[in-house]
Amino acid sequence: MDYLDQQILMKLKENARQSASDISKEIHLSVSTVIDRIRKMESSGVIESYTVITDEKKTGNDITALMEISLEHPRYNELFIENIKKNPNIISCYYLTGEFDYLLKIACQSSEHLEQIHHWIKDQGGVRQTRTHYVLRTEKNIYSPLPEAKE
């Protein structure tokens, strides 16, 4: 990935619905070159998908929480992940080093809803311990940074 690919990616990250024509004007490339580079990044897997980022509060999920999960034994990992993927309120799951095995990002409607999700998680086979943190405010939320662009 070179400097021009990074420029195109930065523009797409700002607005994935931006046309190749608009991008080409901003970074001074031909439209066909921009389209070709986007297609190459899609086929190579650099661009995995295009998605919609929603405001959780405006979609009814007023609470965001981070939950640390410790499993009793690694043999529970596969089943745990299968089950976590089925729950639409768990929007991210990270496998960790340290005291806990997983960190979940959860978006839910209320404290009661979070409590239901917490009980559901505790009922999964092999869950030994959980620790939950309420998010008071999100200060930064990006999905993947790009390395510093070099010309």
Feature-to-residue mapping (PLM):
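A compositional/biophysical signature of low hydrophobicity enriched in polar/charged and small residues
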Residues: 1-151
